[in-house]
A protein has these predicted regions:
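C-terminal helix-coil-helix/basic helical segment that borders enzyme active sites and/or dimer interfaces
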Residues: 25, 29-32, 293-329, 339-350
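DPxDG-like acidic metal-binding loop motif
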Residues: 139-178, 182-183
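Glycine-rich beta->alpha junctions and the first turn(s) of the following alpha-helix
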Residues: 194-291
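Generic structural signal for well-ordered, non-transmembrane alpha-helical segments
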Residues: 249, 285-292, 328-335, 361-364, ...
Length: 394
């Protein structure tokens, strides 16, 4: 059977990825050294078919579901957080393209089976209307996936009939028309290679523009074009879950490493192993339950998002804010699990050869992502509960 045969089953793709996990784990330190995912690892994931996960069946994709996507994100995060982050983002960005108008999808999916693209959607660009499209200029941070990309997605404020109310739109630009600026010198998630990107007066045809506002509640052009409910899910919760799944995997990895560490580490001044001490046993038990609870919460949130896609109704703003805050709490819990087990693992956990210290740095960096900001998310949801207008996009 061909690798890209449309009869691929979700379980088969999951198993293909599972086979790659030892290699992904083995190359995690190299990804950090190179400040980007390792080329051979990314090629193996691409060959396994991961980027066709969300591509519509009409274009030869798999059109798989969100819950299995969560399983994959957790699995990958348990092996290498940086590689997981890039892979899940680039998988999900094929879902974003599937929300575009039909002409854009025919243009791109009609010529290639999937895209590998960062999504730098902050409104850091300008869009100037011209015949047939727009001239785009700007510079964007956080271009996760750009080191292996063939396209980029960027956000730009776009003029409307009301000059005081520009529209925030997403534009698709070929990678070879983009400059990559080496800015990714960070404490954690070093292996993502999420450098800045810049474009200068690049022409983008009109059909490769999509209003982000029209994608937020699940009523995008793609939602009307495709029959599957996965393209009717609200955008921001899907983006949040995309980033949260690797975090839960990172916490699972940390707990597993902590368990191994307890069986090796001696209590200073005694012949006892740390695993024989009640306090260490209790910490392990609490950490295991905490990460299991976070994973259950992650899957429950995903089911709620799927429900909104299946309902055929736009997801209300207050529900999107609620989901955003719940996702942020999952990530905070996962981060705290890692922090707690590293604290109990002794000084050896902080050697650069220890994967625990890398996971700790990665989790602190990952949890600083704007979608996981508990203060902003809490205020936003609280305002809506009180009948006040939202003060942040959701």
């Amino acid at each position: 059977m061909k690798l890209d045969a449309p009869v691929m089953q979700e379980e088969e793709l999951v198993e293909r990825i599972r086979v790659l996990l030892p290699s992904i784990t083995e190359h995690a330190a190299q990804a950090e050294q190179e400040r980007k995912p390792v080329d051979s690892v990314m090629k193996s994931l691409e060959d396994a078919g991961v980027y066709k996960f969300f591509v519509p069946k009409r274009y030869g994709g798999y059109e798989f579901g969100l819950e299995t996507f969560m399983d994959i994100g957790v699995m990958l995060g348990e092996s290498c957080l940086s590689t997981a982050w890039v892979t899940t983002f680039c998988m999900e960005h094929n879902w974003l393209l599937s929300l575009y108008n039909r002409e854009a999808q025919d243009d791109i999916f009609g010529k290639q089976p999937y895209i590998i693209a960062p999504g730098a959607l902050a409104p850091k660009g300008t869009a100037t209307p011209v015949d047939g499209g727009y001239r785009i200029s700007g510079r964007w941070e956080w271009a996760t996936g750009v080191m292996h990309a063939d396209w980029v997605m960027v956000g730009a404020l776009t003029p409307t009939e009301d000059p005081k109310k520009p529209d925030l739109c997403m534009y698709l630009i070929p990678r070879d028309e983009v400059n990559v600026i080496d800015t990714w010198h960070v404490a954690g998630m070093v292996g993502t290679g999420s450098n800045d990107i810049e474009v200068e007066d690049v022409f983008v045809p009109g059909h490769r523009k999509q209003s982000i506002v029209d994608m937020r509640d699940g009523s995008s052009p793609g939602a009307l074009f495709h029959d599957s409910p996965i393209y009717k899910m609200p955008m921001m919760p899907v983006l949040g879950l995309t980033a949260a799944a690797p975090a839960v995997g990172g916490a699972r990895q940390a707990v597993a490493l902590f368990r191994e560490r307890l069986q090796e580490r001696s209590v200073y001044g005694t012949a006892d192993k740390q695993s024989q001490r009640a306090m260490a046993q209790a910490r392990l038990g609490h950490a295991q339950v905490a990460v299991e609870t976070a994973e259950v919460a992650l899957k429950n949130i995903a089911r709620t998002v799927v429900h909104w896609g299946e309902s055929g109704k736009p997801c209300p703003e207050i529900e999107r804010a609620h989901l955003r805050l719940k996702i942020a709490h999952v990530v905070r819990e996962a981060r705290d699990v890692v922090r707690d087990v590293v604290e109990a693992s002794g000084s050896h956990a902080h050697f650069l050869t220890s994967p625990l210290q890398r996971t700790l740095r990665d989790m602190h960096t990952l949890s600083a992502h704007t979608v996981f900001d508990l203060d902003v998310g809490g205020e936003l949801y609280g305002r809506l509960l009180l009948g006040l207008p939202a003060n942040a996009p959701v």
